[in-house]
Swiss-Prot record:
This is Protein RecT. GO terms for cellular component: protein-DNA complex. Binds to single-stranded DNA and also promotes the renaturation of complementary single-stranded DNA. Function in recombination. Has a function similar to that of lambda RedB. Homotetramer. GO terms for molecular function: DNA binding; single-stranded DNA binding. The gene is recT. InterPro entries: RecT_fam (IPR018330), ssDNA_annealing_RecT (IPR004590). It comes from the Bacteria. The keyword DNA-binding applies. GO terms for biological process: DNA recombination. Keywords: DNA recombination, DNA-binding.
Amino acid sequence: MTKQPPIAKADLQKTQGNRAPAAVKNSDVISFINQPSMKEQLAAALPRHMTAERMIRIATTEIRKVPALGNCDTMSFVSAIVQCSQLGLEPGSALGHAYLLPFGNKNEKSGKKNVQLIIGYRGMIDLARRSGQIASLSARVVREGDEFSFEFGLDEKLIHRPGENEDAPVTHVYAVARLKDGGTQFEVMTRKQIELVRSLSKAGNNGPWVTHWEEMAKKTAIRRLFKYLPVSIEIQRAVSMDEKEPLTIDPADSSVLTGEYSVIDNSEE
């Protein structure tokens, strides 16, 4: 059986009995995800505030915007959509929650490319805020010419006064979280550290790392800050999978995840 994503292991549940979706023999992903059986699976995975119809419309739009997605392994695409559903994140650049990218390696079963799910900057903030214990969360880039200093220890502090040159090269990226109990946590990364993370990402040379570098750098700092934040183990595991390996769903396995969580309406900085 194909390995399930971390969250799916915890809440694995059958939604179609012994009936499995038919194997896909062509690249018509749009037709496949509009099948009633797929709508049932997505409906079981989605939180209350989202519908299967909306997620399918979003997925269809992404395929039309990035035609290469339609030529990827269908089960890999479906698996990425299901994980977006599990996390309550909408793929696409409109909200910046998550991105779907064709992944260079070939799927060993179909011979096609896999689909890579990448959590975006705003998606990372949304996941963190769901704990209900975070008052604010933000990330900033530091440029040459900015006044910037930070200290660790018993009296930790961070000072950043931006300069006037908004086009100056980035030197650091940092993320700051203020907790509702009054505590503050921050994480600072150098550009060299950010580039090292990018080099280890399977999507480091395309997609948002190329088109939205600063947002991906901010997301990377927030992701590293997660280890200090009061977020659930399930969310931490999902975040740890970000950009690391493509997900797959076996067509013969009709298992999907169901989960409950509350969504906090947040207006991003």
